[in-house]
Amino acid sequence: MKAMVIAGGVPQMELLRQLKERKIETVLLDGNENCLARAIPDKFYKVNIFNIEDVKKIAVDEKVDFIITVCADQVLLVVAEVSEMLGLPCYIGYKQAQDVSDKIRMKKIFKENKIPTTKYLELESLDMNEIAKLNYPLVVKPVDAYSSKGVRKAETEKELIAYYNEAKKISRSGGVIVEEFFEGEEISLTTNLPF
């Protein structure tokens, strides 16, 4: 059995180790030749991991049985799309990957299904009249980044403006979400998939 792992950061290091313990051959793709997980897989490709055609070609050439990543929701889009294109098994469909990796889509699904969520605005540009409808502190996020990249808590208008501009640069689509801060406990869950 052969697995393609996309992205070579700290979370993927453990994934690669787990796959190797299960005697699964591993192929790692990452845009950084010196990524942290570089030494672990059986084979490594330096490639733009968001280029669907390049990822697909490597998956076909390597005859992988499945494609996987962890802790990277934007990369999950690539995993799901290429898996669907090639008819490979995947733990998430492309539409579901879109729903969880786009914060605006996710918020809309929450509202449609009456799942409590914070008050928010989707902003194409910085509109202080719209923002005045929300209560500080505010959380500013790129709509489509991952690993808390660009997520900042703004206590003042000055911080909000700076964080908005930062989030807009980080967002691949240029979209930014601003939402009211909610004090609470964050819970993370790690699972092992049975292969």
Segments from the language model and where they lie:
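Phosphate-binding site of ATP-dependent enzymes
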Residues: 157-195
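Short catalytic-loop micro-motif centered on adjacent basic/acidic residues
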Residues: 4-5, 66-69, 119, 153, ...
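Short acidic active-site motifs
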Residues: 54, 126-130, 159
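A conserved helix-loop-beta module that forms one wall/lid of the active-site cleft
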Residues: 84-150
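ATP-binding N-terminal substructure of ATP-dependent carboxylate-amine bond-forming enzymes
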Residues: 1-96
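Glycine-rich phosphate-binding loop signature in dinucleotide/nucleotide-binding domains
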Residues: 58-64, 132-134, 170
